[in-house]
């Protein structure tokens, strides 16, 4: 029934590649590359074909098959599967390359570093120590041909064909019969009459010396060449000479050889070896030791081999995060190693971990992720961003830690191109509205405006029309000077998104109000922006046919490609905002925008004007000092231009307490003295007045000037609440009620929404409601007091204590 027989080679779950076999070690085995049929993973397959009349070689091959199958050690070639038939033997191992082939390929690419060679030899000596000291086995075949290298650059000891027991069980060493291998035998084996006392490891340590010579000098031509160390490093020569000494008694045990080489200043005493040893024992290390190791690992990765980082360090980092609770310290080395991966490998190994990290509640990890988002954002697809990352990132907008809130705002610059229409035009802008209106940190309000200016091109046309003008108008009324500058620059950066009607009726009136701003930097930018808008209007006035061309982007769909114009603005503007506002936080805290302290509000006619606060005295010699510091700050701002991601955003968290501690002093003075220094950024050329807008003067300039006016009295309506375009009067008691922006019948808007009206209406309306309630209470109190006084007057005659005379 021969047709029922099955070919075991055909059913073997591994197959040999059709490529020519690699140059394997001298001996019975031929090394092939192969793969697993089920998964396609790469393996190495050692093949021995049984030949008639070669029974001795067949027995050697079968012994090697048995030894490799039963021996398990990290530094010995890893056995995966095997096949034994009457015609052949197959041994499947991890994918490896012969050491000779590996060294030749690396030499062509620039050669191996000494630290790589030290770790490779460390592994081979450790494998010999395991065989001799733990298993009582003599390898009997240590040479270049018996060493293999895996994909991580790890050296593995193979060539177990001629291994025998050190205790004498099963006879002596087998006969090799191969001249290429016999040249590595120690001299005492050639002299049969020699009675020199030797240790069980003496022969293998001699062969180890031959291996060391070959690693540094190439193939060993003859045994006498061992007398010349050649290129062997000086730190290893002393220990090498002990290995190739004629007296077998003085050859050290493999364990002692390792100890000698690991001594301070020794050949195997370096950062690379220490890192590998720690990774081998990382599972039994204490959490504090792991934290320290990962913190220091990032500094060393640049000097480590790329294959080692990809195939050994990366799996340990992923395991440490997945099961070891390593936390945020893993992120820096993880992203550093990720640079060595292809796009496909990054998607398979890094992205799943990153997505899981975003759901973490660890603040340190969230900040690190936001800070390093630029390194992995390109590998994230839109569905992953919208469903698994953005919902977790938005929690940062509501975090009590200012540093996390600001980093979250910053990350939107990278996430915006990948966000869906709903997440971008609704969810994100809802958070931006809350931050710009209510956040107590001036720099966060400022950078929210900056971020909105850059992502404006990604918004839909209807959202742009509804949001941008209101948002930037609100920013121009912020008590924090850099926020006002950001609002002006926001108008400039998004100039192509406004119709001519909006420019004339909405934007220019807002900008004109800033021409009398106390801060010179705000005034300067306002004048430049006004001139640009006026030149645009003038060109349309002279040639109305240009209107369609100028307004071509107003109703266009969101176009990420147009973000380049805003990118130049955001690049330097964000740098200026982050650097200068961080200085402000450290030295001059800003007040929280509140109902009681809103600077630069017009006082209604008829109310008494508050007395101006005295300006702080300035020494006569301060002008020269400020000029020098201006030049210094200008150099710093120029050097740090376009480095949004390099800014120290964490400074907000460090200085939050000082900001809050000094707010009470601001509120009690009513009009805070502003003191600061002037810093100028580099002047940049204007491309048709729109490509970029340099900041002339620091945002902390002008704190020496007093606030213009005090807050208006309670119940007073603000000028911003009147519609100066004219409307029918609805309240006879208020002569300006006819000019109100909102009819009284309209409901109040959601404070987190981006309504059609200007953003300042949110705060003004809140103050209006409170003022109305206070007025009603005062009116009720007045009527009660009048009733009591009338009752007292109605009583007649003198009154006694505790009684009243009856009529």
From Swiss-Prot:
Keywords: Coiled coil, Cytoplasm, Cytoskeleton, ER-Golgi transport, Golgi apparatus, Phosphoprotein, Repeat, Transport. This is N-terminal kinase-like protein. One of its GO terms (biological process) is spinal cord motor neuron differentiation. Residues 792-807 are annotated as: Interaction with COPB1. Residues 587-807 are annotated as: Disordered. Belongs to the protein kinase superfamily. Residues 644-656, 753-763 have a biased composition (Acidic residues). GO terms for cellular component: centrosome; cis-Golgi network; COPI vesicle coat; cytoplasm; endoplasmic reticulum-Golgi intermediate compartment; Golgi apparatus. The modification Phosphoserine is found at residue 753. Residues 14-314 form the Protein kinase domain. The gene is Scyl1. Residues 764-774, 781-794 have a biased composition (Basic and acidic residues). Residues 660-679 have a biased composition (Polar residues). Regulates COPI-mediated retrograde protein traffic at the interface between the Golgi apparatus and the endoplasmic reticulum. Involved in the maintenance of the Golgi apparatus morphology. SMART domains: S_TKc. Pfam families: Pkinase (PF00069). The keyword Transport applies. HEAT repeats lie at residues 350-388, 389-427, 507-545. It comes from Rattus norvegicus. Its main location: cytoplasm. It is found in: Cytoplasm, Cytoskeleton, Microtubule organizing center, Centrosome; Cytoplasm; Endoplasmic reticulum-Golgi intermediate compartment; Golgi apparatus, cis-Golgi network.
